[in-house]
Amino acid sequence: MAAPLKIDYAFNAEDLESSAKIVKFTILKKHQEPDAAQEHELASFEETMLPHMDAAHNLAKWLLRNEEDAQDVVQEAYLRAFKSFSGFHGSNGRAWLLTIVRNTSYTLLKKNRAVDLTTTFEEEIHTSGHESVSPATILEHSENAELIKEAMDELPAEFREILTLRHQEGLSYKEIADIMQIPAGTVMSRLARARGKLKEYLAAHIGKER
């Protein structure tokens, strides 16, 4: 059996370094001659937040479905994160950053009115049996990479988002609930719906159930 496929839009190392430099340059530009305290804050911010730039880009890309918009959103989100960094006292920098990326992405989506941001399905459903569906079942083989991307593109933004957070980034239900600002039970039901719709699309286009 082929290895499970991790479908994402990850930056390569060169892109990551370039975007990190842009973020750092923009921040430094706001502090023409940063003092020791500002330099310490920037160093702490870089250490805590820059390792999550790939995850930030991945989420923005799936939500926006546009590379240029995704990069703009990531940079804007990092600048917002830096402005608020003095108030960050938690231990989960990735979840905190992804919350900002999510909010920034939805602000752009609403501005462009590019998609219907709400799902058309009832959230309160039974989820027994769905949780046994693993990422390997949904994102199965590399030869189906393009088809999986097409299937994801057909989903509402909220479904793309929850699949990305759970199966691409491996976040817990609690982390996803915090990021999406919904109850954990809604996370489970929405994830079950998203998996089901993804499997339906794949079954229809590949000709067999996943």
Placement of each model-derived feature along the sequence:
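Intrinsic, short, N-terminal disordered tails of RNA polymerase sigma-factor systems
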Residues: M1-P51, E124-I138, E146-E158, K174, ...
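Residue-level preference for hydrophobic side chains embedded in well-ordered alpha helices
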Residues: T48, H52, A56, A77, ...
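Amphipathic, Lys/Arg- and hydrophobic-enriched alpha-helical face
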Residues: T48-E67, S84, M152, A203-H205
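Helix-turn-helix DNA-binding motif, specifically the short coil turn and the N-cap/start of the second
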Residues: N66, S172, Q181-T186
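Structural recognition of an alpha-helix C-terminal capping motif at a helix-to-coil junction
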Residues: D72-L79, K83, S91-N103
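Arg/Lys-rich amphipathic alpha helix in sigma70-family domain 2
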Residues: T99-T120, H141
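A short pre-motif secondary-structure segment
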Residues: I162-R166
